[in-house]
Amino acid sequence: MVPFCRSAVSDDGTSEREELAAWLIGPARLSGNAVAVTSGLAERLTRMGVPLHRLRIAMRVDNPLLTAWGIVWGPETAAEIFTISQALRESSTYVGSPSQHVMETGTWFRRRLDQLGPEDHTVLHELAGVGFADYLAIPVTFANGIIQPAVFATRHGSGFADSHIALINGLCVPLSAALEAIAMRRSTASLLATFLGEGPAAHVQAGAIHRGDIVETEAAILLTDMRGFTPLSLVSPPSQLLATLGRYFEAVADAVRAEGGDVLKFLGDGVLSIFQVTEDGRTAACTAAVRAVSRVVASARTEDLPPFVAALHVGPVMYGNIGSPTRLDFTVVGTAVNIVSRLEGIAKASGETVVCSETFASAVPATLTRTIGRSAIKGLDGEHEVFAMAVERDSRA
């Protein structure tokens, strides 16, 4: 039989409970690792005699697609991160659940799973169905008032003893201290990635927060733009226009991310993205950009997206913070960016869908491009050869 929680005292007079709280507030908090905190807590509780067979902690995240993330631990498996979609908050899995009770009332919830009735939530019946005997959820409250549930469950036939319940309930404050900074950092990272893009977000989190924090790099640059947006905006209701823009932006952004690029800007009805040249070389970056355009072309064909044009170029850019001292923007600037902007105009004027510079064309297989003649590019001397990409034939389907 698993013993009740002990109140053992160490050589220096500190109880195990005090040591556990000190670990949560100190080393666990400073680890910055929610998986380590969760697994470490579970292992320590088990050593203290708590018959713990499941520990699940959920934490809110500021993300347009997710409502929460968390960690689930079991004695036979390593602790794993999970995510909870926004849609789940409206489903029967959450509504009326013990987690909802904890989050909305800030009070703990306990239920013996071998004594359930038909009125008890499905989550409890599911756990009982796989052998769990007792369930306890406690509130983990952060300084901003947001409450997250931490769930402890056991398969032990006698369930949790009163001493186990008291010990676990006493973890509310130290567990909050251990997890709050970790959760806030994850939310910050999520927000930065949402509004800046994953690449810029990583730079900002690494400390690139001042005007002039710029690195010189080489990148394949992709600029896409809807055809006929102005006429469309004059005849479409705002809700319909925004829905159309949203579908187009989603198709482009998903394609860019799928190929390892970064969406830097939504410029009216345009999207500016880059694919940094790494040790794999210029060809790899340009090929990734071509694959991204091909994905958008496929989406245009299957999802009835509005017509668009795209321009591609590769070259050196300055990548980082520009703006005023108090209002910064993380983006790319340089001649290469200006060139891709001029190429986008050529695409519109020529009737082509996807065009690229000679520099870009030289980095991809010749079968993907065909010349459409020479054109003056504002800001550059003379005329320069411009190419259409082979994928453009499919983008009008």
Please provide the spans of the model-predicted regions.
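GAF sensory/regulatory domain recognition
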Residues: 57-88
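Regulatory sensory and allosteric helical modules in signal-transduction proteins
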Residues: 76-133
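Short hydrophobic beta-strand micro-motif common in sensory/regulatory domains
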Residues: 133-141
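Regulatory loop-to-helix N-cap segments in sensory/regulatory domains
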Residues: 153-169, 332
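Regulatory cytosolic signal-relay segments
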Residues: 163-216
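Catalytic NTP-binding/metal-coordinating core of nucleotidyl cyclase/transferase enzymes
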Residues: 210-291, 330
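Catalytic core of nucleotidyl cyclases, primarily class III adenylyl/guanylyl cyclases
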Residues: 256-287, 300-335, 380, 384-386
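Cytosolic regulatory/linker segments at or just downstream of nucleotide-handling modules
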Residues: 346-397
